[in-house]
Curated annotation (Swiss-Prot):
Mg(2+) 1 binds at D66, D69, D87. Keywords: Cell membrane, Magnesium, Membrane, Metal-binding, Transferase, Transmembrane, Transmembrane helix. Contains a di-nuclear catalytic Mg(2+) center. GO terms for molecular function: magnesium ion binding; phosphotransferase activity, for other substituted phosphate groups. This is Phosphatidylinositol phosphate synthase. Pathway: Phospholipid metabolism; phosphatidylinositol phosphate biosynthesis.
Length: 220
């Protein structure tokens, strides 16, 4: 992202607030859960009812808690492994709620098949992008980078919603979702390529490991 939208820029705002919340007795995990819950409520109440502008603004505001909990963790000397897993899990939940709210409005508000398809692609690939990296790292492989990551994804989708809602036109959200859909598919391909070209990626697994992976895959 550009310097204007970077974490360093927001740190100037979040660091003092993070220190104040810590002094008040709040924890990073508490802030993570609150921010996610608020984002989910905003996305699933405002987007499906056609309030795209206010939905986009509300989700953007609560998404800032994703930076605030990290600032709190750094201020107290570091985060925990559980906190990292909780943060990543909550990110996936919030992203799913945003796309679910938008796909509902696309289908039943605007009746746009094209927007429904684009939003569903974005919903699926947003989860796959994260899963590829997590699964690769669990296997000792590399899956960093890619064209689109979560901050860029939020900026694109929320900008589309805010402009469509603010000006009462459909094309900003349509454009944003299709741009994001294509970019997300490219990112999945980039990450899979990074995994495949990682050292040891094509080494044969021992029979016991291969059987375990197969069994896990076949579980319901």
């Amino acid at each position: 992202m550009s310097g204007l939208l970077s974490r360093e820029t927001f740190a100037k705002i979040t660091n003092p607030l993070a220190s104040a919340l810590l002094r008040a007795g709040f924890t990073p995990d508490t802030v993570t859960i609150f921010g996610t819950a608020a984002s989910v409520v905003a996305a699933l109440t405002l987007f499906p009812t056609g309030h795209l502008f206010w939905g986009g603004m509300a989700v953007w505001l609560f998404a800032m808690f994703d930076m605030l909990d990290g600032a709190m963790a750094r201020a107290r000397g570091g985060g925990t492994r559980f906190g990292a897993v909780l943060d990543a899990t909550c990110d996936r939940v919030a992203d799913g709620a945003v796309f679910a709210g938008l796909v509902w409005w696309a289908a039943f508000g605007w009746g746009s098949t094209s927007l429904v398809v684009a939003t569903l692609i974005c919903m699926i690939t947003s989860q796959v992008i994260s899963y590829v990296k997590a699964r690769a790292e669990a296997s000792g492989l590399r899956a960093d980078g890619g064209l689109i990551e979560r901050p860029e994804r939020l900026i694109i989708v929320l900008a589309g919603a805010i402009f469509s809602g603010g000006f009462g036109v459909q094309w900003p959200l349509h454009t944003a979702m299709w741009v994001l859909a294509v970019a997300s598919l490219v990112t999945v391909a980039q990450r899979m390529h990074a995994v495949r070209t990682s050292p040891g990626a094509l080494d044969l697994l021992p029979n016991s490991d291969a059987g375990q992976d197969t069994a896990e895959t076949n579980q319901p």
